[in-house]
Design a protein with these regions (language model features):
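Conserved small-residue
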Residues: 251-300, 554-556, 774-874
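Flexible loop and strand-edge segments within Gram-negative outer membrane beta-barrel domains
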Residues: 261, 297-336, 340-347, 353-432, ...
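Extracytoplasmic gating/loop element in the C-terminal half of outer-membrane beta-barrel translocons
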Residues: 293-294, 306, 435, 439, ...
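Outer-membrane beta-barrel transmembrane strands
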Residues: 311-330, 335-338, 352, 433-487, ...
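Short loop/turn motifs that connect adjacent beta-strands in outer-membrane beta-barrel proteins
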Residues: 243-248, 327-329, 363-369, 384, ...
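Short, small/polar-rich motifs associated with maturation and membrane association
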Residues: 1-376, 384-385, 428-429, 455-456, ...
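Surface-exposed loop/turn segments flanking beta-strands in extracellular/periplasmic regions
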Residues: 271-301, 390-440, 491-506, 551-583, ...
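Small-side-chain secondary-structure face that scaffolds active or pore-lining regions
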Residues: 342-355, 366, 372-376, 382-384, ...
Length: 1024
C-alpha cells in the first residue's frame, strides 16, 4: 500500500502546531519576576541588594528604588541578600515584595584585623573591637576619648587642660626604656608614624572622632605579630565610616561646650601674705626690713593671680556628613569644624576636617574599590603653661600692670616691663632668679602653629573570576603633614630683658616641618570552606613597602620687631638694623621599611582553631648585618561550647572558648642611622679653632638591632543567656630583650665615651578581666553594664651586657628646679622610672624635720649615695573602667567611671613652694602652699636634698567619673524623614583621690599641671 505524501500546506500547518505546543510549554515554565526589596525598619527601598535564583548564577541587583526584574522558572527559589540584613529565600512569583530584617549580629561578627578581617567566633588572639554605638559619648574632640576606660589592658592618660591636648595610650604597659612605648596606629589600612608634627600631640589628634566607625585593639603577639617590628606596644586599628547602599542620608551633629577651670592652688591672699611675712621676719634686721619694704610697696594692692590668668573656656563642634549611593557609587562626604577657647587666656585651638569615601564595585561585584581621603587643618595658639605655677606663687601684693614707682636710686618705672609689673634689681635690670609676671608670660609671647595633614588611600580587592575563593588586594596610601609656626617675644618685655645676651630686643623661633609617609601593600588571600573534612582554611601572603621622609627647620634669631612665625629663616640686614628673611637649609632624613608577611587561619569542626603568622621586616635604620628581623606567632583556640558534650549547657551558656598564643614582635622606633659614622658641623658660637667650619665625627653603634618582645597569652571567652552576659579573662607575660641603653665604651674605640647599645631586658605580666551585661531588658526599659579591670607589673631584669652589681642605673626623670634634680631611675630589679629619693627624717611627733634626710650609709655626710629606690613608680598596679547605660523609651542616661590604683606622683610644686621662707636675699618674694606649710611647718629655704625627699612622693590613686550624658531620641519630627537626638553631658564630673595636687592624672613629676576643666555640653544630632 502506498503512503500518501503530505502536501506543502500540511507540512507548514504541522510545524506551526508543534511550535505552538513548545511555546506554550516554554511560557508555562519561564516566569518574568518583578519585585521590590524594602528595609524592614524604615520601609525604604534597599539599593544594591543581591537577587539570585538559588543554585544558579542567574541574578541581578535592585535599582535606586529597591526594585528588580529577573527571569526565572516556576518552582525556582529566589535568594535575596544584603550586608547587614538577614538573607531571605522565597518561591519565585510574578510580583514579589520582600522585606529584609536587620541582622546587626552579622556585622558584629566581623572584626577588622591586620590585612583583612575575621569572624569574631574565629578569633584566637587577644582582640577587642569597639563599635560606634559602644563608644563614649559627650563632648569628645579627640579620638582616644571615645574608648577611654572601655578596653581592658588599654590605659589612656589624658593630656593637660589645654585646648587640643592629646592623650597618652599604653597597651599592657610599655615594652621599652629608651624607644617609643606608643602603640602602632593603623587608619584605614595605613600604619601612621607616631612622631607627629609639632603642634599635634599624637597621631590621632588630626582625626575627626565623628568619622570613626570602629576601633580594634590588638593586644597579644599572636594578633599583633603580623605588623612585626612595630607591634611590641600593641596595635590600634581604626576604620572610618564608609558610603552606604541605601538612599542618600544627611547627618548633622552640633555641640556647644562651657569649660569651668574650677581647680586652684591653695595659696594666701594679699592680707594673709602680708601678715605671714610680717610674722616670719623680725623687724630691725636687714632681711626683715627688706621683706617689709617689698610687701608694703603698694599697701592697698591685692591681686588674685590665678583669677587673672584663667577664663571660662568655650567651644563649638560642628559636623555634617552626606552618605548614600549616587548611581553605582556608594559614597560618604563629611565636613567638620571645632573651635576651642582655652581656660588660660590667649589659648585657642581650631580644627577643620574633611573626608571623602567612595566604595564602588565592578565586574559583577568581583572588584571592590575603596577610596579614602581625609584632610585636616589644625590651628593652635599656645599659652605658656608655666603661667599656672607663676600665678600660684607670684606675690599677691603686687599689681598686674606696671605702676610708676619712684626709687631713690633708680628713679621711676623700676618694675615696669612693657606695661607689666615684674621684679627688678635695677633700672632695666630684671631679677633673673624670679618668675615673670603671669600675664606677661601670656601676652608678651606670641606662640602659634598650623598643621595641615592629608591622609588617604585607594584599596582594590579583586575576587578572581573562576576562582572566587582567591582575592588579590592592593593598597596604596599616603600620610602627609606640614607644620609651620613660631614664637615671638616682644621687645622691652621682662623675658627679653632677662636674657643677658639680647637685653630688651625682640627674639623669636620659627619652625617649618614636613612629615611624609608613602605605603604600598599587596597580598593574596585564599579562603575555602571544605565541607568534606569539616574545615575552613584562610591563607594570606603579602608584601609591604613604606617610605618615611622628614624635614625639619628651626631657627632662633634676635633683634626682631614682629612675629616672623612661618618664615623660613632670617639674616641680619645692616641697613634695616634687623633680621630679615633668607633661605636656610632644612635638615631632611628618611627611612624605609620593606616587609614580607603571611597568615594561616584554620578551623576544624568549628571547634578547633589555629592561627599562625610570620613577618620579615627590613629597616634602613639598622646596618646590613642587623637589617632584617623575623617575627613569628601562633595561637590555638578551642571552642568548647561547640563540643557535643556541651549541648545541654547551651541552654545557659552561649560561648566558652579557650585561647593560647605566643609570638615575637619588634621595636624599631629609634633615631635613624645610629650605626653610621656621621659628621656634624661645629657650633658657630664655639671658641674652638675653625668654629662652625669644623666637621667632627659623632659616636656610632654598628651592632645596633631591634628590641624584641616575646609574649605569652592565655585567655577564656565566655557568654551566658545568648551572650546577654559576656566577657573574657586573660593572662599575659611579655619578655623584652635587647633593650636600648646608653653604655660606656673603651677609650679610643669610638668617637665618644657613651653609645646606644642593645644590652637590657625587661619582664611585664598581668591579668585582665572584663564583663558586659544587659542587666534589665523590657519593652520600655533596659540597663547595660560594662566593667573591666587590669592588673599589671613591670620589672627591669638587665641593663648591662655583663652582670655588674655596682651599676647604678639610668637617670629617668628630673624636676626643673635647681640645675635639674633627678628623681627617678631605671634600675635592675625595679619597675621602669622608679622614684630614687632621700629618706625624710621625722621628729618624735611625726612631723618632718626640714632639711634633714637619713644618712643611710652612715658615712657622716649626705650625698646621692644616701638615696634609695622607693619601689614606687608612676605606673598603676591596677586600672579599671565601668560604663553604665540606662534606656527608658526615648530617653537614655549613661556614665563612665575610671580608676587607677597604685600609681605615685612626686609633687614637685609642693617641694619647691612648700616653705614659709618666701623671702631671702634673692631680692623678690613669693607666695606658697597654705596647706603644705600648715602641715609641715617649714620656715627655712629648702635644701636640694629636701626637694628630693620622699616626703613629697604621694599616692595618686584615683576614681574619676569622666562623663555623664542624658539624651532624648526622636523620630518623625515634623516629617517622617527627620530623626535625631538631643543630649546634655558633663565631662570630668568628679575625682576621688588622696593626692594633694590639682590632678592625680599627671606626669610622674607634677610641676604646675594645666588643670583640666569641668565641661558642660549641649548637643543635637539630626538625620534627614
Amino acid at each position: 500500500m502506498k503512503t500518501k505524501k503530505m502536501n506543502e500546506p500540511g507540512k507548514i500547518m504541522l510545524l506551526f502546531l508543534v511550535a505552538i505546543m513548545f511555546t506554550v510549554q516554554a511560557v508555562a515554565q519561564n516566569l518574568s519576576v518583578s519585585g521590590l526589596v524594602q528595609d524592614g525598619t524604615t520601609g525604604e527601598g534597599v539599593i544594591g541588594a543581591n537577587v539570585v535564583v538559588k543554585g544558579t548564577t542567574n541574578g541581578t541587583i535592585t535599582d535606586l528604588d529597591g526594585k528588580f526584574k529577573l527571569q526565572a522558572k516556576q518552582g525556582d527559589i529566589i535568594v535575596i541578600s544584603f550586608i547587614g540584613y538577614k538573607t531571605q529565600e522565597l518561591p519565585a512569583a510574578a510580583q514579589m515584595k520582600v522585606v529584609l530584617k536587620d541582622d546587626s549580629k552579622q556585622l558584629d561578627d566581623v572584626v577588622v584585623i591586620g590585612y583583612g578581617s575575621v569572624k569574631k567566633e574565629d578569633l584566637s588572639g587577644s582582640v577587642v573591637a569597639i563599635k560606634a554605638e559602644e563608644m563614649n559619648k559627650g563632648a569628645v574632640t579627640s579620638p582616644e576619648e571615645l574608648i577611654m576606660g572601655k578596653v581592658p589592658g588599654l590605659a589612656v592618660a589624658q593630656g593637660d587642660g589645654g585646648p587640643g591636648s592629646g592623650s597618652t595610650l599604653r597597651i599592657r604597659s610599655g615594652s621599652s626604656l629608651n624607644a617609643s612605648n606608643d602603640p602602632l596606629i593603623v587608619i584605614d589600612g595605613i600604619p601612621v608614624a607616631n612622631n607627629s608634627a609639632p603642634g599635634t600631640p599624637n597621631a590621632l589628634s588630626t582625626i575627626n572622632p565623628n568619622d570613626i566607625e570602629t576601633f580594634t585593639v590588638l593586644k597579644d603577639a599572636s594578633a599583633t605579630a603580623i605588623y612585626g617590628s612595630r607591634a611590641s606596644n600593641g596595635v590600634i586599628i581604626i576604620t572610618t565610616k564608609k558610603g552606604t547602599q541605601g538612599k542618600i542620608k544627611v547627618t548633622y551633629n552640633s555641640s556647644y561646650t562651657f569649660k569651668d577651670p574650677y581647680k586652684r592652688f591653695e595659696t594666701m591672699n594679699a592680707d594673709e601674705f602680708r601678715q605671714a611675712v610680717t610674722n616670719q621676719y623680725a623687724e630691725g634686721t636687714a632681711l626683715g626690713d627688706a621683706a617689709r619694704n617689698l610687701i608694703n610697696l603698694y599697701p592697698q594692692q591685692s591681686t588674685d593671680w590665678q583669677d587673672a590668668i584663667y577664663q571660662s573656656g568655650l567651644s563649638t563642634d560642628q559636623n555634617i556628613s552626606v552618605a548614600g549611593k549616587a548611581g553605582f557609587m556608594p559614597f560618604r562626604v563629611s565636613l567638620g569644624y571645632n573651635n576651642e577657647r582655652g581656660t588660660i587666656k590667649t589659648s585657642k585651638y581650631e580644627r577643620y576636617t574633611a573626608s571623602v569615601n567612595l566604595s564602588p564595585k565592578f565586574f559583577d561585584d568581583h572588584l571592590r574599590v575603596d577610596i579614602n581621603v581625609k584632610g585636616t587643618i589644625n590651628k593652635n595658639r599656645f599659652a605658656d603653661s608655666g603661667a599656672v605655677g607663676a600665678a600660684a606663687f607670684f606675690d599677691p601684693t603686687k599689681p598686674i600692670y606696671g605702676i610708676d614707682t619712684e626709687d631713690p636710686t633708680y628713679g621711676s618705672n623700676l618694675y615696669n616691663y612693657n606695661g607689666y609689673w615684674n621684679w627688678s634689681t635695677g633700672k632695666n635690670t630684671p631679677n633673673t632668679l624670679s618668675s615673670a609676671n603671669p600675664l606677661s608670660l601670656l601676652y608678651d609671647v606670641d606662640n602659634a602653629g598650623t598643621t595641615k595633614r592629608s591622609l588617604g588611600n585607594i584599596q582594590l580587592d579583586y575576587k578572581i573570576h573562576g576562582l572566587e575563593d582567591l582575592h588579590a588586594n592592593l593598597n596604596v596610601g599616603y600620610d602627609v603633614a606640614k607644620s609651620t609656626g613660631g614664637n615671638y617675644t616682644v621687645p622691652g618685655s621682662f623675658q627679653t630683658a632677662k636674657d643677658s645676651d639680647f637685653k630688651n630686643i625682640g627674639r623669636g623661633n620659627d619652625w617649618n616641618n614636613l612629615r611624609r609617609n608613602h605605603l604600598l601593600d599587596f597580598y593574596l588571600n585564599y579562603a575555602k570552606n571544605i565541607e568534606s573534612i569539616q574545615s575552613n582554611i584562610n591563607v594570606m601572603a603579602g608584601y609591604s613597602w613604606q617610605h618615611f621622609y622628614y624635614r625639619d627647620l628651626s631657627i632662633y634669631k634676635s633683634n626682631v620687631t614682629e612675629n616672623l612665625g612661618t618664615k623660613e629663616g632670617w639674616t641680619y640686614n645692616d641697613d634695616e638694623g634687623r633680621y630679615i628673611q633668607n633661605n636656610n637649609t632644612p635638615s631632611p632624613w628618611e627611612n624605609y621599611l620593606v616587609s614580607f608577611f603571611g597568615r594561616l587561619n584554620y578551623s576544624f569542626k568549628e571547634r578547633y582553631l589555629l592561627t599562625a603568622t610570620l613577618r620579615q621586616d627590613g629597616s634602613s635604620r639598622f646596618s646590613k648585618s642587623n637589617r632584617w628581623g623575623l617575627f613569628p606567632s601562633a595561637a590555638l583556640a578551642w571552642s568548647i561550647i561547640n563540643e557535643p558534650f556541651m549541648e545541654k549547657a547551651r541552654d545557659i551558656m552561649s560561648n566558652l572558648k579557650l585561647r593560647v598564643g605566643y609570638g615575637v614582635t619588634g621595636q624599631q622606633e629609634i633615631t635613624d642611622y645610629l650605626y653610621i659614622t656621621n659628621y656634624s658641623l661645629g657650633n658657630n658660637t664655639t671658641s674652638q679653632y675653625m668654629g662652625s667650619y669644623l666637621l667632627k665625627p659623632d659616636g656610632y653603634s654598628p651592632d645596633l638591632k631591634w628590641e624584641q618582645t616575646a609574649t605569652y597569652n592565655v585567655g577564656i571567652d565566655y557568654g551566658f543567656l545568648n551572650n546577654r552576659i559576656n566577657g573574657s579573662i586573660e593572662y599575659y607575660q611579655k619578655r623584652t630583650k635587647d633593650l636600648l641603653n646608653t653604655v660606656s665604651v673603651a677609650a679610643g674605640s669610638n668617637f665618644t665615651n657613651m653609645i646606644t647599645a642593645n644590652v637590657g631586658s625587661m619582664k611585664n605580666e598581668g591579668l585582665e578581666f572584663n564583663i558586659n551585661a544587659v542587666a534589665i531588658q523590657t519593652k520600655d526599659f533596659s540597663w547595660e553594664l560594662g566593667y573591666n579591670v587590669t592588673w599589671n607589673t613591670s620589672k627591669i631584669t638587665k641593663l648591662t651586657a655583663t652582670y655588674n652589681p655596682d651599676y647604678e642605673g639610668i637617670n629617668a626623670g628630673s624636676a626643673s628646679y635647681g640645675s635639674g634634680t633627678v628623681l627617678q631611675k631605671h634600675q635592675v630589679g625595679y619597675a621602669p622610672s622608679t622614684y630614687w629619693l632621700f629618706q625624710q627624717v621625722y621628729d618624735e611627733n611625726g612631723k618632718p624635720v626640714q632639711n634633714a634626710v637619713v644618712d643611710r650609709n652612715n658615712d657622716g655626710q649626705i650625698t646621692n649615695d644616701d638615696r634609695y629606690m622607693t619601689k614606687k613608680s608612676p605606673m598603676a598596679d591596677v586600672y579599671m573602667g565601668l560604663s553604665s547605660q540606662f534606656t527608658y523609651k526615648n530617653w537614655d542616661l549613661g556614665f563612665n567611671l575610671r580608676a587607677s590604683i597604685g600609681n605615685y606622683v612626686y609633687n614637685a610644686s609642693v617641694a619647691d613652694n612648700g616653705s614659709l621662707n618666701a623671702f631671702s636675699n634673692q631680692g623678690f618674694i613669693t607666695n606658697y602652699y597654705k596647706s603644705a606649710v600648715e602641715s609641715t611647718g617649714f620656715t627655712l629655704t629648702s635644701s636640694t636634698e629636701q626637694k628630693a625627699s620622699d616626703l613629697f612622693l604621694e599616692n595618686a590613686s584615683f576614681l574619676k567619673m569622666d562623663n555623664i550624658t542624658l539624651g532624648y531620641t526622636f523620630k518623625n519630627l515634623f516629617t517622617s524623614k527627620l530623626s535625631g537626638r538631643i543630649s546634655a553631658s558633663v565631662q570630668n564630673v568628679f575625682t576621688i583621690t588622696k593626692y594633694s595636687g590639682l590632678d592625680p592624672e599627671c606626669n610622674a613629676i607634677d610641676q604646675s599641671l594645666w588643670p583640666r576643666p569641668r565641661t558642660f555640653s549641649l548637643g543635637i544630632n539630626l538625620n534627614f
